[in-house]
């Protein structure tokens, strides 16, 4: 059973997803932050399989947030810019959805020859999510065909390459 994150998966969790949470002003690290973190390296196997840019994903997530607030009568422009959130040292608290993605990524990585959890295992875990999860809603909004992404990941090199 895989027990360690690959270097790229560790960077995803400890740096990129945390950076996305901080950038968005969120106090907890969620599935949407993990998805955005996967898109930081547009040349990675996970990002190529998704076929979505980081800029497009950020814009779509911002639009989803604005729409949710507008549905209850709040206009985001009236709120102004919030102060950046500081997590101090270490990882911000994980949402329950993000914790579930970690468990699922471990399950996805079990058959791995390398014994490591790769970024593609996180992507496979994120693809299994359903609405109302934020990452699932973002994937749907971006028009990501989950079956096609899974096929791309199952191609040469399987889910092992980051």
What do these predicted regions represent?
Residues 1-162:
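Histone-fold recognition with a strong bias for associated Lys/Arg-rich disordered tails
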């Amino acid at each position: 059973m895989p027990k360690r994150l690959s270097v790229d998966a560790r960077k995803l969790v400890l740096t990129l997803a945390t950076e996305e949470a901080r950038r968005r002003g969120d106090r907890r690290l969620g599935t949407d932050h993990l998805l955005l973190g996967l898109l930081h390296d547009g040349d990675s196997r996970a990002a190529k399989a998704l076929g979505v840019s980081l800029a497009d994903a950020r814009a779509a997530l911002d639009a989803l947030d604005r729409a949710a607030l507008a549905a209850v009568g709040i206009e985001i422009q009236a709120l102004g810019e919030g102060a950046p959130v500081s997590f101090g040292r270490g990882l911000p608290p994980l949402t329950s959805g993000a914790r579930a993605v970690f468990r699922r990524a471990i399950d996805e990585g079990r058959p791995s020859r390398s014994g490591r959890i790769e970024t593609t295992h996180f992507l496979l875990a994120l693809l299994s999510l359903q609405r109302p999860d934020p990452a699932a809603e973002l994937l749907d909004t971006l028009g990501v065909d989950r079956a096609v992404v899974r096929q791309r990941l199952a191609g040469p090199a399987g889910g092992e390459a980051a």
